[in-house]
């Protein structure tokens, strides 16, 4: 495991008094006691079972899983995020106290994964909803990769300046947006439907009921204009 940068010592005295800055001391205390909120929706989340065991034992890094976002300062998102779950994820993030961090784990969380090509309900990347500090690719990532991602996050925290992070968060607010269609193949014919174009949220006029239209001659729903 990579070494972590601890607070820089300004000076020491013969009576064992250490002098440092409040910012460095705060960073060191936070990186040594990260309390994660585990947000798992599919198979990537199963890898956390290996971390809990004695072989990896992520408790030794000061990680204490919490069930409440108000007690957590790190949220680990693993698995596919759907449009129905997006408001709940944003609400959990907003309920976390400052300073708070996000690790996006797995291809489905980062880009939508294999569901991003023809699924109307999949969010193409969790960073469209909340700011992400560390991206962890893989399908699924190994437990060693998860530990490495946590190590990189701890290094990032050790070099952090509190005022800069607050200023960045004030200028980049997160919010939910409706996800729109790309041009895709219909369910039955395999032909491209030119009516379902990808448009910005402000200009899209496609009504939700127009996405699926049932016909008596079709056994399954078909995308129509």
Swiss-Prot record:
Entry EC number(s) = 7.1.1.-
| CC cofactor | [4Fe-4S] cluster
Q: Please tell me where this protein is predominantly located.
A: plastid
Q: Which domain of life is it from?
A: Eukaryota
Q: What class of enzyme is it?
A: translocase
* UniProt cross-references to InterPro entries, sorted A to Z: NADH_UbQ_OxRdtase-like_20kDa (IPR006137), NADH_UQ_OxRdtase_20Kd_su (IPR006138)
Q: Could you say which residues bind [4Fe-4S] cluster here?
A: 43-44, 108, 139
Name the GO terms of the biological process aspect. Answer: aerobic respiration; electron transport coupled proton transport; photosynthesis, light reaction
Q: Which UniProt keywords apply?
A: 4Fe-4S, Chloroplast, Iron, Iron-sulfur, Membrane, Metal-binding, NAD, NADP, Plastid, Plastoquinone, Quinone, Thylakoid, Translocase, Transport
Q: Which reaction does it catalyse?
A: a plastoquinone + NADH + (n+1) H(+)(in) = a plastoquinol + NAD(+) + n H(+)(out); a plastoquinone + NADPH + (n+1) H(+)(in) = a plastoquinol + NADP(+) + n H(+)(out)
What is one cellular component GO term in this UniProt entry?
respiratory chain complex I
Task: Quote the subunit structure annotation.
Answer: NDH is composed of at least 16 different subunits, 5 of which are encoded in the nucleus.
Q: What task does this protein carry out?
A: NDH shuttles electrons from NAD(P)H:plastoquinone, via FMN and iron-sulfur (Fe-S) centers, to quinones in the photosynthetic chain and possibly in a chloroplast respiratory chain. The immediate electron acceptor for the enzyme in this species is believed to be plastoquinone. Couples the redox reaction to proton translocation, and thus conserves the redox energy in a proton gradient.
Family according to the record: Belongs to the complex I 20 kDa subunit family.
Q: Would you tell me the protein name for this molecule?
A: NAD(P)H-quinone oxidoreductase subunit K, chloroplastic
What's the source species for this entry? Answer: Populus trichocarpa (Western balsam poplar)
């Amino acid at each position: 495991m990579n070494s972590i940068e601890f607070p820089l010592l300004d000076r020491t005295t013969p009576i064992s008094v250490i002098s440092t800055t409040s910012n460095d001391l705060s960073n060191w205390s936070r990186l040594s006691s990260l309390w994660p909120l585990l947000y798992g929706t599919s198979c990537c989340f199963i890898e956390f079972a290996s971390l809990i065991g004695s072989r990896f034992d992520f408790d030794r890094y000061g990680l204490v899983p919490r069930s409440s976002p108000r007690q957590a300062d790190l949220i680990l998102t693993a698995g596919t995020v759907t449009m129905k779950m997006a408001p709940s994820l944003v609400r959990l993030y907003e309920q976390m106290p400052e300073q708070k961090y996000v690790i996006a784990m797995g291809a489905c969380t980062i880009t939508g994964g294999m569901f991003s090509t023809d699924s109307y309900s999949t969010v193409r990347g969790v960073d469209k909803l909340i700011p992400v500090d560390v991206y962890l690719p893989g399908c699924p990532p190994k437990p060693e990769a998860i530990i490495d991602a946590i190590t990189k996050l701890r290094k990032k925290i050790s070099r952090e300046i509190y005022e800069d992070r607050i200023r960045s968060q004030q200028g980049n607010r997160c919010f939910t947006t409706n996800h729109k269609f790309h041009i895709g193949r219909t369910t039955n014919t395999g032909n491209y439907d030119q009516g379902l174009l990808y448009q910005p949220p402000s200009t899209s006029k496609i009504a939700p009921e127009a996405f699926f239209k049932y016909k008596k001659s079709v056994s399954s729903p078909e995308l129509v204009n």
